Amino acid sequence: MSKSAVSPMMQQYLGIKAQHTDKLVFYRMGDFYELFLDDAVEAAKLLDITLTTRGQMDGVPIKMAGVPFHAAEQYLARLVKLGKSVAICEQVGEVGAGKGPVERKVVRIVTPGTLTDSALLEDKETNRIVAVSPDKKYIGLAWASLQSGEFKTKLTTADKLNDELARLQAAEILLPDSKNAPQLQTASGVTRLNAWQFAADAGEKLLTEYFGCQDLRGFGLDSKEHAVSIGAAGALLNYIRLTQNLMPQHLDGLSLETDSQYIGMDAATRRNLEITQTLSGKKTPTLFSILDGCATHMGSRLLALWLHHPLRNRAHIRARQEAVTALESQYEPLQCHLKSIADIERIAARIAVGNARPRDLASLRDSLFELAQIDLSATGSSLLETLKAVFPETLPVAETLKAAVMPEPSVWLKDGNVINHGFHPELDELRRIQNHGDEFLLDLEAKERERTGLSTLKVEFNRVHGFYIELSKTQAEQAPADYQRRQTLKNAERFITPELKAFEDKVLTAQDQALALEKQLFDGVLKNLRTALPQLQKAAKAAAALDVLSTFSALAKERNFVRPEFADYPVVHIENGRHPVVEQQVRHFTANHTDLDHKHRLMLLTGPNMGGKSTYMRQVALIVLLAHTGCFVPADAATIGPVDQIFTRIGASDDLASNRSTFMVEMSETAYILHHATEQSIVLMDEVGRGTSTFDGLALAHAIAEHLLQKNKSFSLFATHYFELTYLPEAHAAAVNMHLSALEQGRDIVFLHQIQPGPAGKSYGIAVAKLAGLPVRALKAAQKHLNGLENQAAANRPQLDIFSTMPSEKGDEPNVDCFVDKAEEKHFEGILAAALENLDPDSLTPREALSELYRLKDLCKSVS
């Protein structure tokens, strides 16, 4: 395509677009951002805006679409949510300053991971960008948040990469454009960069220059050992510099993160526990949404961070617990202060990248003064004392802003009225000229009326024609000779005089000069604030931590959460534990105990469908998780030993993108658990093996349970409908049978949701199907088939020889016939016990008692 065939403006556009082929270009033209050619077609489709044409290029109409400048943020937000990146091209030259189009250049690039504008961000979500740099053995990760200044790195392995990305909840992922780039479970938000940008040498050079140090050892990074992490961090910092068109000034150091800092949770566990997102992808009801009572958006974001990063350091946990206890008496006054605090964290980020607005500074000023008034004296908490000590450090910044910024400044700097009176003498003088213009005009009008004797004479102003003297048509002919005609209207004539023209020039010049000076002064204020960014970030973090801790304190009081105890020996003891989310969704929640220790490491959980097995297991995991955030827990008491990881294998779903069936997903997640769980891990296994044939599933479930008992030795909750597995406690002393109870009332079933010792008597599957609304005919047929299958299973005992090849804990072969007999005996005992439990002998008539006796006899025949 020949550039000579297009206009100079389009030549300019094509030159800019050639540098940003992978992005949409917002090209500023007056009060609009315009998009051209393929960008226009894509934007029109994504944003539902009008696609039109303007001019031609090589004989073809140029496609064009545009959005108003003042509404650009909402369109940018929509594009970013769709994973698009946008290059913002502004007019930087003066209109009419020379030949050709006005000078334009890309001033910033908006990408999903580098947002700072509040209109483009979710208030309660942290926006992170992650760089991934692989080598043959390890993968280096680096991530940053431009809103908080967070900048961290970590070494990981390929099998843990997707779990790390799930933990970080990356909005954008930077990958090298090479064949050895790792495979991700998500394709959205991925940006490919040239592989050389991840080079460790270049990364170390850029990082040492940025931090002003000779090497990175002070950050815990060794040039050889952490080469891939350094390469990732360097690529990330360079990408931020390119997109923001400047080097960020607020990244808070570079820290090396290790697995030992936090309790590990893989992607499946975070999903199954519904920490910040439900299984259906919604934001409520989740653990975060139920707990979040924070007064500030900073606090809400920190709460989500703590929930995804439960601590392992007991000293840090106890410090949080002590603060929660101390804040019980301080909650109300503290909340009054916190509710007045703006989002200091994000305001600081906008100051750092140069796009803070006047009202950002006013909000920052008011918030800093508010924080300085917080009184946390005599709390006895060292953590609270440390947090409070941060706030006085920002008072000089607040005083500077008080002097520099109007109490209620304009939204936009271009509208003026931003810099405070008395801050700069020259600005005050220019404003005086503007503001006292009304007095001059009134005096001039009175003087001219007296001089001319014309009663209809008025002195007025509008933005198009400036200042003028207006006379009615009838008196216009009597205008003095020094009146120069400016505009003719239907019923009036407008004039200008040398005196009025001189005043107009003075006022308009003063206005332009004042706006230019305000911009200069505002930029100076921002420059000074950048030197105070470390103090502002510390204040933001301290305010957020106070907010979360006070929220924890309120939860303890309002929802009867208790302070958990920590032990150095293996134990998970919970008295009357409750599911923190479910108990808020139902009228009555049944609390349950949990007892796991060195003697009992695996709880074999049986019971009816809808009986509450999954809820109970999640409840245990969530209580353990909450305890390690410093939050109190929903229970009467809790004691928890060392925990390194939490694993879950719950639910079923296909992975069509990876061509994996439901059963394949289940086995992959199970394999990961068996390879990584340790003696200090919490493992939840729900209905393992149900995705294949009955005996295959039973064999796998048995083998997995034994592996957890003998090899992993983790604290495991193992829910199953395979009643044959209930023999495990006889072969393995570390296993214990528990069940969720239910009560049959005639042909109906009542779920008691109560954990009780021993195996369940039956699954009540048909009763649950009845509750679901299956037709009566289908239910009767199911009952008939069930009776037949149970009789057939009893007659074909040799089919259960699948366990004959499995060694017991002692290494000998289990007696299969004995296993079958005992399992069936337990099954029969459970059914008989359930039937007897429903009888009330004192209320039966003789005839009813005889009838019940016959029914029990028939029941014995059906299961014998």
Curated annotation (Swiss-Prot):
Domain of life: Bacteria
GO cellular component: cytosol
Nucleotide-binding recorded as keyword: yes
A Pfam family per the record: MutS_III
Keywords: ATP-binding, DNA damage, DNA repair, DNA-binding, Nucleotide-binding
GO molecular function, one term: damaged DNA binding
Single GO BP term: mismatch repair
InterPro entries, per the entry: DNA_mismatch_repair_MutS, DNA_mismatch_repair_MutS-lik_N, DNA_mismatch_repair_MutS/MSH, DNA_mismatch_repair_MutS_C, DNA_mismatch_repair_MutS_clamp, DNA_mismatch_repair_MutS_core, DNA_mismatch_repair_MutS_N, DNA_mismatch_repair_MutS_sf
Residues noted as binding ATP in the record, renumbered to the chain: G607, P608, N609, M610, G611, G612, K613, S614
Family, as annotated: Belongs to the DNA mismatch repair MutS family.
Job description of the protein: This protein is involved in the repair of mismatches in DNA. It is possible that it carries out the mismatch recognition step. This protein has a weak ATPase activity.
Official protein name in the record: DNA mismatch repair protein MutS
Organism name: Neisseria gonorrhoeae (strain ATCC 700825 / FA 1090)
Lineage of the species this protein comes from: Bacteria, Pseudomonadati, Pseudomonadota, Betaproteobacteria, Neisseriales
